[in-house]
């Protein structure tokens, strides 16, 4: 898999794929060998109209989407009529509501980072209603042994979920409430909005991977959760139809790109990255290290019910084939590195590896990367970020090493809880995302996990995953085995073992234990998350 722009026939066709991330929109044109023929990207502007609010302007997002598609095709030297199909990958749980007749939004996109529903989250999680729900569901699970009741007994709302941010919007935006009463309201995550715009209002749909990340979808029954929607007074009538991940969603209106390109895939970004990494088999693991860390394991044909904070997701549904994932995340991975750069601990992120290896260890300094609390398996939104063990001998180099080590330590925590909870034998581990370019973090993660980790030649796995699904849908690629042969690996990181201890991560066992003490002291720091 590489980058190529010459030597094509006009009869050749190609796959377009767009990834709408938190900070950028990227489009690539792929050929049969999964080589990139052309690319274009644009920034996503985040808006902060009030403290804690994080929004995206829908018109600006749409303009950016159209721009990168046209730009990528132009960059490839190809023609739009050679684009066989379009795949779309998007950030999850960022949503908007709009008038189904006019397409006019009732508000801007409320992103997954938005905190406006924090008080609602605290209120609901501590309410008698939720305590009753948990009790009833535990009883139903005891009587029936059905895991979906166990899952319901463990439901805890967070601001990252769509659920209570949507409740906030329904409670606080009069035009939205009126539209719901009039039956003219549409709800949708970014993929749904793009489908609506691309088809000039003909399609109101999403796919199972995006729906499962909203926290108002029942992954066991494979439908919107009537129970949760009823509990939160969310009208089912505003929700989009849920389709297979590989599905002909419609045609791009010819007025947009000049030709009617079939839209053959919409997919959530982490699930798309999993597909792009060809993690098709039960036990395959993907670690994406970017703005945050997302660790996903393929759990096969059944959703995983977690008691430690792993989230059950639909990976994808292609025909009768449904693949589920269990996901753990650690927020603030990239944020910690960006913060250190802003503090001038280094000028270029590429320097961090050399800085970290320029000292033998962190000199007893530990960093806790909890700018947004701690997620699985600790699940403490009140945790604070901290440095511990500072002393007169501490230098910038020790601080940088401690920050990089903390990312690998959180990877170890997520991996351990994943092993403990799922009890699924690990078949392979692949890593992607911008932070995985750091060899120090990659090698330390391999050491701590005691596993070989493969790093791909290209890191834009969400885009590639959506392209793969779109291409399978039109027969551009025949099957998943063909896709595996197209995937190239930049480097394998093999675990180093301590000569004295002969155990995985043995060199770091004492350091990890000390870091975990620092972690405990950073927990429950704030009165409110």
UniProtKB/Swiss-Prot annotation:
Gene3D superfamilies: 3.30.420.40
Domain of life: Eukaryota
GO MF annotation list: ATP binding; glycerol kinase activity
GO CC terms of this entry: cytoplasm; mitochondrion
Record flagged with keyword Signal: no
Organism in which the protein naturally occurs: Danio rerio (Zebrafish)
Keyword annotations of the record: ATP-binding, Cytoplasm, Glycerol metabolism, Kinase, Nucleotide-binding, Transferase
One annotated GO biological process: glycerol catabolic process
Entries under CDD domains matching the protein: ASKHA_NBD_FGGY_GK5-like (cd07793)
Record's function text: Skin-specific kinase that plays a key role in glycerol metabolism, catalyzing its phosphorylation to produce sn-glycerol 3-phosphate. Involved in skin-specific regulation of sterol regulatory element-binding protein (SREBP) processing and lipid biosynthesis.
Residues that coordinate or bind ATP: 22-23, 291, 334, 434
The protein's name in its UniProt record: Glycerol kinase 5
Subcellular location: Cytoplasm
Main location: cytoplasm
Enzyme Commission code: 2.7.1.30
Listed pathway(s): Polyol metabolism; glycerol degradation via glycerol kinase pathway; sn-glycerol 3-phosphate from glycerol: step 1/1
Pfam families for this protein: FGGY_C (PF02782), FGGY_N (PF00370)
InterPro entries (UniProt xref): ATPase_NBD, Carb_kinase_FGGY, Carb_kinase_FGGY_CS, FGGY_C, FGGY_N, GK5
Enzyme class of the recorded protein, top EC level: transferase
Reactions the enzyme catalyzes: glycerol + ATP = sn-glycerol 3-phosphate + ADP + H(+)
PANTHER family referenced in this protein's UniProt entry, alphabetically: GLYCEROL KINASE 5-RELATED, SUGAR KINASE
